[in-house]
Amino acid sequence: MRIIVDADACPGKDIIEKAGKENNIPIIMYCDINHIINSDYSEIKYMDCGFQSVDMAIVNAVKEGDIVVSQDFGVAAMCLGKKAYPISPKGYIYSDKNIDRLLFERHLGAKVRRGGGKTSNHKKRNKEDDERLYGNLIYLIKNCDTVLESEELKIKNEE
């Protein structure tokens, strides 16, 4: 098991590293060359600035059982297909039970914006997001064998 992070604009990198260090889980952070990330624990991999280059590097690198931190629903969907455990930087766990809805909502939002409409802005990150991210990372680390089929997952995403 590894923790792979889509680190370009990922809040909570310190929380991810804390969970990884405490459980002796290696962390690999992927970002493009326009971002500088310093870490004494994580391995940092820099990609070209090309369209989706970081996303594709993550999907190509991920293995079954890895935890992937990304706010990109497309990356999450592809990682689910590889039997990995995607989680958002706000701590929401993606699963086969919620990814289709999330992708559909993303599609609808893009369609509205292309038509000149506006969609709602995301809420600012808060302390609860940090706590959810840490708690659900630990939950995934400890329960990765059964988590994606679990009814408990619904509760973890609502906390």
What are these regions, as identified by a protein language model?
Residues 2-159:
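Nuclease catalytic cores that cleave nucleic-acid phosphodiester bonds
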